[in-house]
């Protein structure tokens, strides 16, 4: 790997900034000042320091976000803020992208990474990765709806795989229900459309889990953090 590419990947600065830092003698390779941006290094063997601090190269990064409403799950958009706008410069420099998508008015768990292989595995229909949602519903969900979900709902453009519907609470006076839904797919507006098929309406939707990942209750909407070592190991094992 070229030295300048390594330094950019470690978020030392932009390609132009890195070249200036090299000229200023602020970077050392194996204890010697290095000014050539084109120098080929082995990131697994060579010791690279910036202002005396050892730099560690990470090929892949993994972030958990509590996506807020009003933000879209994309890397760029001409009209709306994206989830990348919620990250800091260092995180954005890793060129991460959202794994799957949550609707603009849906909030909750979202994984961002630059690991394309992991993203492909999590989104592959063959793997049937479960995703769990908490929904506030206008209308009273009943046992017959549980059975309809379990059979697989035939929507206009596709038939849903059997899904698990749990009725957490109902309020007849307010004509509302709280439910938990687990699906193995992730089609456009799927949970909302499944509930609508039963004659009710989702008024708030939050994703709680994706595979082995569980939304951190300490993350406020719009906040994010790196996956813990344990979370990452369990996730990688689950798709191996």
Residue map of PLM features:
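Basic, flexible Lys/Arg- and Gly-enriched helix-loop patches that mediate nucleic-acid binding at interfaces
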Residues: 1-240
């Amino acid at each position: 790997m070229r030295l300048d590419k390594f330094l950019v990947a470690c978020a030392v600065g932009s390609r132009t900034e890195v070249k200036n830092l090299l000229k200023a003698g602020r970077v050392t390779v194996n204890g010697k000042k290095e000014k050539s941006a084109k120098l080929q290094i082995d990131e697994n063997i060579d010791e690279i320091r910036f202002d005396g601090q050892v730099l560690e190269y990470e090929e892949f990064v993994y972030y958990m976000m509590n996506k807020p409403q009003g933000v879209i799950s994309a890397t760029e958009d001409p009209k709306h803020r994206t989830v990348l706008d919620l990250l800091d410069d260092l995180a954005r420099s890793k060129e991460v992208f959202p794994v799957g998508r949550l609707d603009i008015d849906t909030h909750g768990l979202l994984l961002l990474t630059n690991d394309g292989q992991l993203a492909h595995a999590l989104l592959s229909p063959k793997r049937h990765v479960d995703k769990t949602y908490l929904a506030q519903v206008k209308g009273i969900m009943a046992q017959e709806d549980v059975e309809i979900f379990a059979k697989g709902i035939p929507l206009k453009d596709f038939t849903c795989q059997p899904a698990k519907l749990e009725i957490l609470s109902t309020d007849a006076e307010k004509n509302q229900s709280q439910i938990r839904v687990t699906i193995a797919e992730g089609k456009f507006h799927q949970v909302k459309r499944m509930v609508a098929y039963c004659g009710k309406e989702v008024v708030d939707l939050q994703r709680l889990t994706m595979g082995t990942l569980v939304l951190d209750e300490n993350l406020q909407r719009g906040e994010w953090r790196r996956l813990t070592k344990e979370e990452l190991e369990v996730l990688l094992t689950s798709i191996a």
